[in-house]
Amino acid sequence: METSSLWPPRPSPSAGLSLEARLGVDTRLWAKVLFTALYSLIFALGTAGNALSVHVVLKARAGRPGRLRYHVLSLALSALLLLLISVPMELYNFVWSHYPWVFGDLGCRGYYFVRELCAYATVLSVASLSAERCLAVCQPLRARRLLTPRRTRRLLSLVWVASLGLALPMAVIMGQKHEMERADGEPEPASRVCTVLVSRATLQVFIQVNVLVSFVLPLALTAFLNGITVNHLVALYSQVPSASAQVNSIPSRLELLSEEGLLGFITWRKTLSLGVQASLVRHKDASQIRSLQHSAQVLRAIVAVYVICWLPYHARRLMYCYIPDDGWTDELYDFYHYFYMVTNTLFYVSSAVTPVLYNAVSSSFRKLFLESLSSLCGEQRSVVPLPQEAPESTTSTYSFRLWGSPRNPSLGEIQV
């Protein structure tokens, strides 16, 4: 499907065959129709969902600044850039019209550069978000001091600068060239392709390093941090007493899981400094159980989505690296041809499902998202600023929202 850096060599057929056959590309019509439908669906849902996510974030600027907003914006912009540039180019020049490459040398380099840039920006943004959440859960006092919107902006700026640097080599090793020549020695215009300009050995080294840096290490870090966070959530749930229990010791981490929850801790410390014994009443009700379980499930889902969508993509690239040139049979080559299309489809699916993850990790974002979607459909509803959660009654329990902010404990809840 693609005569490029990740397309294995194939023995040259007879010169009497068609150009596509001579260049080793022959996609069946049913596959073209099927993947066109899949690409079109991914493009429509992904661009609409991520554009609406950006709209929600920008529309909520009047609200209290929150760190989640910047993470959502970074991930949505990365997904939009990937879908808007890569999907149309690949659908035209890699699915339907393999030769000649029509987007020029700059388009060739830009296509691969943007794809690598967005891949790095996405996985590094997810890793940074997981690191912030882990710190907020495990070290709430330190998180209160370190995790500010300004520092989050700087962190994400660093993520994008690093992504630019890491993706730059792809714009150097890729380029446009002619695969065939005429009888008079001039390049065959119809054989113009977007392909690799360095040796295959150099490309193999680059791919292996790229898979390690853009997938294995960031995803391992994300899984490790999310695992720590999930373990803390499970421990917190097991430590919550029954509805009739009262605790006379220092507030547990359940009260300190969010930035706003620290106000209760400070008030508790001030009460102790006056020589008064403080006691907080906490309840193990159904809503609290659901909240903790939901938080753990979301963290697992984030890792699962990127493993399912990205692992086949990188496995296919490594497949190219580890199979020698003389090991490519016609059957293996045909398998790789269609495996390429399947893995790229999954790769783009990860960008299309990011709005679903946003809605899963933040109830306030979900409310704004649905309100914006309803307004576009003609239903006018009131809009609340992101990322503030809906107010809770004073009799409710200390609820924990992994991505939102629980309410502050009131003075009336601190029994003297």
UniProtKB/Swiss-Prot annotation:
Gene, per the UniProt record:
Ntsr2
Q: Which residues lie on this side of the membrane: Cytoplasmic?
A: 56-64, 132-154, 238-297, 359-416
Entry function: Receptor for the tridecapeptide neurotensin. It is associated with G proteins that activate a phosphatidylinositol-calcium second messenger system.
The record places the lipid (S-palmitoyl cysteine) at: C377
Q: Could you tell me which PROSITE patterns the record lists for this protein?
A: G_PROTEIN_RECEP_F1_1, G_PROTEIN_RECEP_F1_2
**Can you say what this protein is called?**
Neurotensin receptor type 2
Topological category with respect to the lipid bilayer: Multi-pass membrane protein
In this entry, the parts of the chain located on the Extracellular side of the membrane are 1-32, 88-109, 177-217, 319-337
Instruction: Show the SUPFAM superfamilies listed in the entry.
Output: Family A G protein-coupled receptor-like
Which positions carry Phosphoserine?
Answer: S410
- Cystine pairs annotated here are C108-C194
